[in-house]
C-alpha cells in the first residue's frame, strides 16, 4: 500500500470501540471480523426488470464483487435506479428519462459517501446509467472503475436483423400502409431477443465507448455482448482493479482530464455516435471541474472523420463490431494518426498509449470501420449549429446521407404528441421543417427524446424530404435531418418560441447555422409579445428538476449555481 491510509473512508465507519454498533449492523449483512480490516468497495448495480438493458446486471454485480473479495477487499452491492427510454418513448413518462441521470448520480453519491466505501465499481446498462454513474464517480473522487453491462444481440425476422429502432420505424411504415398488422407484430415480437443494451451505435453503446476512451473502464469493456464470458471476466477484473487503484492513489479526476474528454469526443465522432454524447460529456466534465464547451466539439470535429458504418445511419450492430475486435483497433488507428492524447492516464494504472501498444488491427476485408483515407464523412457528423434560432447553440446529427443543408417551411408544435399525430396522419409533407418546442430541460421539463416522431418520418418514407428541429433531444437511434438541444429553449424565451407556421427555416451544416428567415426587427416584435407559459408541473421531481436544471448547452445539470 501507499503511505496513505489503506481504508481512508471505511476506517471512519468501523474502526475503534465506539464503532461497535456499526460493526454489529454489518455482521448481520455478512461481514466477518476479518472483513473490517479490508477496504470496502461499493458495487453500484443498476439491475432492474424494467428493461432488457439491465435485467442481467445483478449477476454482473456478483461477478464484480467476486473480483473485489478475491483481491483482498470487501464488496458491498447496492442498487440505484434505471428507467427505459425505449419503453417510455413518446409518452409523458419520457420526461423522467434525463431526470434519471441526476437521480442515479445523486443516489450513488449518497450511498457511497454515507456508508464510507473506499472505492466503487459502477455497472450501467441503459442510456442514462453511464453518465449518471460517471457524474457520481467524479463527485466522489474515490478509486473507481465503470463497467458497461454490454450490448444486446440482434433480433431476426425473415432473414433480416432487427433492433428496437426497427420497431419504431415499422410503426411509421404501418401508418403509411407499407406493412400490415401481422408484419408489425412479427417485427415487434422478434426485435429484442434478450438482455443487453440497444444494439446500434445508439446512446448506450456510444457512452460506453466514450467512457472507455476516457479511461474510466478497462480496455475492451465497451464492446462485449451482455451475456458472455468476456463480460463476466470484465466485471471480475474491474473489482480487482479498484483495489489496485486504491493502492496507487489514482482517482477519477486524475483520469478525467480535459485531454481525456477530448479523446472521448474523438472516439464518439469516429464511431458516428449519438447526439446525447454532447449533453452527457458536458455534464460529466462539469462534475470533474473540467472546462468543456460546445466549441470543443466543433474544434475536434473539424479534424476527426466519421469512420464507422454502424446503425442507425449505417448497416452494422455493436455485436458485429465486437466480432471484429471492438473499438481498441480503432483507437490505435486514431492514436497513430495523432488524433488521441496517448499520455492520458487510465484505470489500468497505465496510459492510453501503453494500453493500446498491443492492440491488434481489424481483420483484412472488413468494411465496418473505414480507413482514415476513406471515411464515411471527412469530419464530424455531430455539428454544432448557431444562428438566430440557436444563439447559444444546437446539436445536429448529419452524416451527409441526408445532404448538408435543408431549407423548408415551418410546421410548429408545442409538444411531441401533436407532432407525431401530424406525421402519422399525413399532415407533414415534403419540404416541411417540423418544429417541436417547449420540450427543453425546463419547458418539458426533462428534454424528451424525439425517437417516435423521427422514426415515424422514416417509416413514412420522408427521411430525406423533411427536417425536424427541437429544444428536446434525440435518441441515439434517430437518423435523418434533425437538430436538437436548441438553446436558449423556448420556455426561457429563446427564439424558437416565436417561430410561426409558414416561416422559412434553413439548416446548413457547412456554415453551421440554424436560421429563421425573419428580420431581426420582426423577431424582436414577436419576442416582445411572447409570454412564458405556466409551468407544467408545480410539485414533485419534475417541478424540482425544472427549477434547478441548467441549459442543454451546459449539460443540463442540476447542481450548478447553487
From Swiss-Prot:
[2Fe-2S] cluster binds at residues 53, 126, 198. Keywords: 2Fe-2S, Amino-acid biosynthesis, Branched-chain amino acid biosynthesis, Iron, Iron-sulfur, Lyase, Magnesium, Metal-binding. The active site is at 475 (proton acceptor). The keyword Transferase does not apply. InterPro entries: DHAD_IlvD/Edd, Dihydro-acid_dehy_C, DihydroxyA_deHydtase, DiOHA_6PGluconate_deHydtase_CS, ILV_EDD_C, ILV_EDD_N, IlvD/EDD_N. Pathway: Amino-acid biosynthesis; L-isoleucine biosynthesis; L-isoleucine from 2-oxobutanoate: step 3/4; Amino-acid biosynthesis; L-valine biosynthesis; L-valine from pyruvate: step 3/4. This is Dihydroxy-acid dehydratase. It comes from Methylococcus capsulatus (strain ATCC 33009 / NCIMB 11132 / Bath).
Amino acid at each position: 500500500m501507499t503511505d496513505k491510509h489503506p481504508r481512508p473512508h471505511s476506517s471512519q465507519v468501523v474502526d475503534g470501540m465506539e464503532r461497535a454498533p456499526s460493526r454489529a449492523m454489518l455482521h448481520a449483512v455478512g461481514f466477518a471480523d476479518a472483513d473490517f480490516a479490508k477496504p470496502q468497495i461499493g458495487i453500484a448495480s443498476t439491475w432492474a426488470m424494467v428493461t432488457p438493458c439491465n435485467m442481467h446486471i445483478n449477476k454482473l454485480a456478483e461477478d464484480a464483487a467476486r473480483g473485489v473479495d478475491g483481491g483482498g477487499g470487501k464488496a458491498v452491492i447496492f442498487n440505484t435506479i434505471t428507467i427505459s427510454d425505449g419503453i417510455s418513448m413518446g409518452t409523458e413518462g419520457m420526461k423522467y428519462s434525463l431526470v434519471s441521470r441526476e437521480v442515479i448520480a445523486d443516489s450513488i453519491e449518497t450511498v457511497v459517501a454515507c456508508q464510507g466505501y473506499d472505492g466503487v465499481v459502477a455497472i450501467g446498462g441503459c442510456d442514462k446509467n453511464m453518465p449518471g454513474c460517471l457524474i457520481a464517480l467524479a463527485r466522489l473522487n474515490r478509486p473507481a472503475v465503470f463497467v458497461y453491462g454490454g450490448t444486446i444481440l440482434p433480433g431476426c425476422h425473415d432473414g433480416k436483423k432487427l433492433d428496437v429502432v426497427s420497431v419504431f420505424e415499422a410503426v411509421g411504415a404501418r401508418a403509411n400502409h407499407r406493412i400490415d398488422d401481422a408484419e408489425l407484430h412479427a417485427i415487434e415480437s422478434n426485435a429484442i431477443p434478450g438482455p443487453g443494451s440497444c444494439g446500434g451505435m445508439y446512446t448506450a453503446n456510444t457512452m460506453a465507448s466514450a467512457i472507455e476512451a476516457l479511461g474510466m473502464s478497462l480496455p475492451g469493456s465497451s464492446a462485449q455482448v451482455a451475456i458472455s464470458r468476456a463480460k463476466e471476466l470484465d466485471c471480475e477484473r474491474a473489482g480487482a482493479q479498484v483495489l489496485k487503484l486504491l493502492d496507487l492513489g489514482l482517482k477519477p479526476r486524475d483520469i478525467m482530464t480535459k485531454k481525456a474528454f477530448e479523446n472521448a469526443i474523438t472516439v464518439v465522432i469516429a464511431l458516428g455516435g449519438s447526439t446525447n454524447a454532447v449533453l452527457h460529456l458536458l455534464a460529466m466534465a462539469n462534475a470533474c471541474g473540467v472546462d468543456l464547451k460546445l466549441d470543443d466539439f466543433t474544434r475536434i470535429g473539424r479534424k476527426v472523420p466519421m469512420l464507422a458504418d454502424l446503425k442507425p445511419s449505417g448497416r452494422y450492430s455493436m455485436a458485429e463490431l465486437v466480432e471484429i475486435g471492438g473499438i481498441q483497433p480503432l483507437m490505435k488507428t486514431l492514436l497513430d494518426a495523432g488524433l488521441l492524447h496517448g499520455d492520458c492516464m487510465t484505470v489500468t494504472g497505465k496510459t492510453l498509449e501503453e494500453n493500446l501498444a498491443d492492440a491488434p488491427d481489424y481483420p483484412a476485408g472488413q468494411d465496418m470501420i473505414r480507413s482514415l483515407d476513406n471515411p464515411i464523412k471527412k469530419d464530424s457528423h455531430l455539428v454544432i449549429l448557431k444562428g438566430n434560432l440557436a444563439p447559444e447553440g444546437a446539436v445536429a446529427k448529419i452524416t451527409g446521407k441526408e445532404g448538408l443543408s435543408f431549407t423548408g417551411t415551418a410546421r410548429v408544435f408545442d409538444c411531441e404528441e401533436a407532432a407525431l399525430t401530424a406525421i402519422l396522419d399525413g399532415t407533414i409533407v415534403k419540404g416541411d421543417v417540423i418544429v417541436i418546442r417547449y420540450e427543453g430541460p425546463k419547458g418539458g421539463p426533462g428534454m424528451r427524446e424525439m425517437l417516435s416522431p423521427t422514426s415515424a418520418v422514416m417509416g413514412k418514407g420522408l427521411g430525406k424530404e423533411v427536417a425536424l428541429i427541437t429544444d428536446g433531444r434525440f435518441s441515439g437511434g434517430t437518423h435523418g435531418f434533425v437538430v436538437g438541444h436548441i438553446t436558449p429553449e423556448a420556455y426561457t424565451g429563446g427564439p424558437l418560441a416565436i417561430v410561426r407556421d409558414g416561416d422559412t427555416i434553413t439548416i446548413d451544416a457547412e456554415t453551421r447555422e440554424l436560421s429563421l428567415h425573419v428580420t431581426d426587427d420582426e423577431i424582436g416584435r414577436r419576442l416582445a409579445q411572447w409570454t412564458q407559459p405556466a409551468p407544467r408541473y408545480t410539485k414533485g421531481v419534475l417541478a424540482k428538476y425544472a427549477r434547478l436544471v441548467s441549459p442543454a448547452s451546459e449539460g443540463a445539470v442540476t447542481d450548478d449555481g447553487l
